[in-house]
């Protein structure tokens, strides 16, 4: 059952526990979970071709051994395998490849594989962020399928392009402009159309980096002639 279905059934306590229950963990309890998850990943990574390109036959059994055996690495240490997208060398089967620029690197871009389990974790994380962004106290939040979200994101294959897809698996929030249209527009075009639509449809959410928020504020200023808008 996804977030939309639980909201419809008014299962608010269950929603909070599923997505935000981690806030009740003690620091020791939280770190115990993180250590267990890290050691699961170490085992997977150690047994794949990518991991062995660094480990050279070693197999760390726990986090302490991993720290002793594995040197600090950079993207360049994995680039030959990742840039050629060799799934047989990875610990899991990628369902999508994300990319970003590689400043000063030997190739114009960097790519990173995302498995289904990684996407599931990403989906849960962005849903938790959505809930917490509207929360004033434990268990209290204000999220609905009728909410509107400004699409001020870089589309796929950039990582932020996963955001509307992941959220769409949980709830039918409307993006302004619609994702299918936004991905074919420039950043400036998306912002201008999104703000024009928001003036008519009641914008509820915005997600972006600080630099993006600044660029968006400039777009808003140009649309309002520098007068700004009244926020309720």
Language model regions located:
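Nucleotide 5′-phosphate-binding alpha/beta core
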Residues: 1-99, 103-232
